[in-house]
């Protein structure tokens, strides 16, 4: 982990992904070799074993091809790390790197039409505290194009909210993949609902909290989006044919900016 942080400067999520990949490989190899984890040797993992492991996580753990390739990249990085420090393993590293990433057909991008996004935004109840939070979350993601992970990490101090009376736009600072930061403008409607949500709270707090006043996770946000998407399907049945998640809302913003609907936001 020190190498990933200090020398590679990888983002926290990537660090965790690499750690999990190595853990899965170690457990799988120990089971196949019928050894305890602390008895494993580097020679217990060869190219054939790596291919078997990748097939296992695809078929048994139901990993997508993208996740499979992420696991492979982590193992290649581990092999390179070992070879750099122990040159006697250069051939072993080269052998593992003969295992290539798997190609996949590009997934079709799912877009929402204006009536569909409206139905999604209207699904939360404004009569409850959690309903108000969920509407604020959906509108924020719709406005900013934030990923679920980015929305989960937004703190109150990342928001710059203005009334707009002097022409100053509200904005949010989003912390994305690889430590990248970008600033996104916020509409008046988004500003108003966020002001209500964060009133009286500490600037260091996350904007979106769960019912226990703990920060929402990206998994929690995904569950919220899919729950309201199911509710919105009752109003717009065409949505039943679409796989809707946080990224679907993210895809709507570029479409919106190219349409006449954007002027009214």
What role is predicted for each listed range?
Residues 1-265:
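Conserved catalytic core of the tyrosine transesterase superfamily
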